[in-house]
């Protein structure tokens, strides 16, 4: 870019000198041509070379070709009888063309910088423990199960589990969140994050190629391959448009003089001048550059907020969102169970929870984890539990504190012949029997995410007409969550195949021109994510399925970012449309003026380079989309 700035500056100085020489020195036309050829070739050699190479490679009709024939024509027109020289105009057109390209390069660089911060998350080395020594190796050379050491300030190279130490992680490059994430022994650690404080030893759970950082880099690098409808149209349009423009210019130059009353040679310079203006004005740079640049800026703006969109075609889709379907667990809720209520039956409440937590101490079921978390670990350790038996589809039976305790569902109570009581609360009901008598029940519920309600409200404000929740939970649970969040409808008790069927039904019912998005956690939702018009995966940090199956990946667990992605997409589409209509409007106006003789080469320069620069700056607004 520095070289181009120098070239433009030197050309501008030489052009001013040439204009002064022409004004104050009465020189023959051929000498003036030589003087003007110096700045012309200095600034235009690259364009002329590209045009020539395009001719030999079969890419005849491009902007370099248009600029070349227009400026060469302007240089030659002065040698025609009765025509005025247009040497300064020829150099000015080429100079401003290069200035326009300079602004384009700058804007494209800014747009790419907005995404390149994600490519910078790739780690260079991994510190691996081998034979009692720590050595630096390439992340690609680390196998699953090896121990790596991550020091403060270093980027985590590979996914794994912390086996020693505790620290805070900076996940801003992935999620857009400024708050650090605390981790300790037993926690998963994702590649691409920066270790902020303590030294941690990590046991790798994936090879580098399958780690989060590799998946994200692959996603970002391929994002510009999926073009939007607008981009695809502009690309096809330019292929047809440019040859048509050249033919129209030739027609304008040669046909009117044939029918002119003054004779062909007398009127040919006038119409040739108009044809050259026509060529300069018709250059499609503003459209070909600014529209893709708008979408690239939108992708960058979204990525900075932790929303990875796999291509600008999905920006198009998000802008037309009409129906949003949510999976419940892990999407609108945390997918972590907590004890909501304890209802004893002629039994002490504390004792009921105490015994249930003891019996579930060795269970791997999420309900067991919720019960253990609800009771202090030291109390659990102080009680002897024997003869633990986990009964599939029923619950757990064990001896605790000299009593036979059964913790499970209503089917377990029926098998024991124990009369149990139903509960008016929604959630998972865990019944407890002690020594063959009903002791009460515990209500365990999935916790709704803090910003789930705001996510639904945000989508409503943006005009999304229908919000739906699908869940495999009971009817009562689904109803409670749907009412709490203000969803339009819900469907409970669904198997994975049922969810696909529901999405297909909703797609058939959606309004024409609208898009249906399915939002899931990416763990067991791959079939539905693929079936929806747009698949949005929550919590991309650590979910391979999310990155593989979805079209849009939210790198954290905030469903409210869906509305943010929609806002960015709509703003991006709006900016692209502004550029299209502005460029077409100005060009058509000046083309009309040029055809009837009121256009000038300076107007043509503005219609081409000026419009391109303005469109590029407008496209850069997509980078700051909110």
Regions found by a protein language model. Give the residues of each.
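Juxtamembrane coupling segments of multi-pass membrane pumps/enzymes
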Residues: 92-152, 183, 309, 477, ...
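Juxtamembrane helix-loop transition segments at the membrane interface in multi-pass membrane proteins
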Residues: 52-62, 103-117, 293-312, 620-626
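Conserved cytosolic catalytic loops of P-type ATPases
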Residues: 117-210, 313-356, 399-400
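Transmembrane helix-loop-helix hairpins at the membrane interface
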Residues: 1-125, 227, 236, 243, ...
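Membrane-water interface of transmembrane alpha-helices in multipass transporters/channels
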Residues: 26-37, 61-68, 82-93, 233, ...
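Soluble-to-membrane junctions at the N-terminal ends of transmembrane alpha-helices
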Residues: 1-12, 45-75, 217-250, 271, ...
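Membrane-embedded alpha-helical bundles of multi-pass transporters
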Residues: 20-27, 50-59, 72-83, 301, ...
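Cytosolic catalytic headpiece
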Residues: 117, 312-534, 567-570
């Amino acid at each position: 870019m520095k070289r181009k700035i120098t070239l433009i500056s030197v050309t501008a100085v030489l052009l001013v000198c040439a204009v002064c020489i022409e004004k104050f020195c009465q020189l023959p036309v051929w000498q003036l041509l030589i003087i003007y050829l110096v700045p012309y070739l200095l600034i235009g050699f690259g364009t002329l070379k590209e045009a020539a190479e395009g001719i030999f490679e079969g890419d005849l009709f491009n902007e370099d070709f248009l600029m070349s024939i227009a400026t060469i024509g302007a240089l030659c027109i002065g040698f025609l009888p009765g025509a005025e020289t247009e040497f300064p105009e020829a150099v000015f057109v080429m100079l401003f063309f290069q200035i326009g390209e300079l602004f384009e390069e700058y804007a494209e660089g800014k747009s790419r910088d907005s995404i390149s911060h994600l490519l910078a998350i790739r780690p260079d080395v991994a510190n691996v423990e081998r034979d009692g020594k720590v050595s630096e190796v390439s992340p690609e050379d680390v196998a699953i199960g090896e121990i790596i050491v991550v020091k403060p300030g270093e980027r985590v190279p590979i996914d794994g589990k912390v086996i020693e130490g505790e620290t805070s992680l900076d996940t801003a490059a992935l999620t857009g969140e400024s708050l650090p994430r605390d981790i300790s022994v037993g926690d998963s650690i994702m590649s691409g994050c920066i270790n902020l404080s303590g030294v941690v030893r990590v046991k790798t759970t994936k090879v580098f190629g399958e780690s989060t950082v590799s998946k994200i880099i692959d996603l970002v690098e391929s994002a510009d391959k999926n073009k939007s409808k607008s981009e695809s149209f502009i690309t096809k349009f330019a292929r047809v448009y440019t040859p048509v423009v050249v033919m129209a210019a030739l027609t304008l130059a040669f046909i009117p003089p044939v029918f002119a009353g003054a004779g062909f040679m007398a009127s040919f310079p006038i119409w040739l001048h108009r044809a050259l203006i026509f060529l300069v004005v018709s250059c499609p740079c503003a459209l070909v550059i600014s529209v893709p640049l708008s979408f690239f800026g939108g992708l960058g703006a979204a990525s900075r907020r932790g929303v990875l969109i796999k291509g600008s075609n999905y920006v198009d889709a998000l802008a037309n969102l009409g129906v949003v379907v949510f999976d419940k667990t892990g999407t609108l809720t945390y997918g972590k169970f907590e004890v909501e209520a304890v209802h004893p039956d002629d039994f002490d409440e504390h004792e009921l929870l105490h015994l249930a937590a003891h019996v579930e101490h060795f269970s791997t079921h999420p309900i067991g984890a919720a019960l253990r978390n609800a009771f202090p670990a030291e109390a659990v350790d102080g009680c002897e539990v024997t003869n633990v038996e986990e009964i599939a589809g029923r619950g757990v039976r064990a001896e605790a504190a000299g009593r036979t305790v059964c913790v499970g569902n209503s089917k377990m109570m029926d098998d024991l012949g124990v009369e149990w009581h139903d509960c008016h609360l929604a959630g998972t009901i865990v019944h407890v029997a002690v020594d063959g008598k009903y002791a009460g029940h515990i209500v365990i519920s999935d916790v709704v995410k803090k910003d789930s309600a705001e996510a639904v409200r945000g989508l409503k404000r943006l005009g999304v007409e229908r919000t739906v929740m699908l869940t495999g939970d009971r009817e009562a649970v689904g109803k409670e969550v749907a009412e709490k969040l203000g969803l339009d409808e819900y469907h409970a008790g669904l198997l994975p195949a049922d969810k696909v069927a529901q999405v297909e039904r909703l797609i058939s019912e959606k309004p024409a021109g609208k898009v249906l998005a399915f939002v899931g956690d990416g763990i067991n939702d791959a079939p539905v994510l693929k079936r929806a018009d747009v698949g949005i995966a929550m919590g991309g940090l650590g979910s391979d399925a999310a990155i593989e199956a979805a079209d849009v990946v939210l790198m954290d667990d905030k469903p409210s970012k869906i509305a943010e992605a929609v806002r960015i997409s709509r703003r991006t589409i709006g900016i692209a449309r502004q550029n299209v209509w502005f460029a077409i409007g100005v060009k058509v106006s000046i083309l009309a003026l040029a055809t009837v003789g009121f256009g000038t080469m300076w107007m043509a320069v503005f219609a081409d380079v000026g419009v391109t620069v303005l469109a590029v700056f407008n496209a850069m607004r997509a980078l700051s989309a909110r």
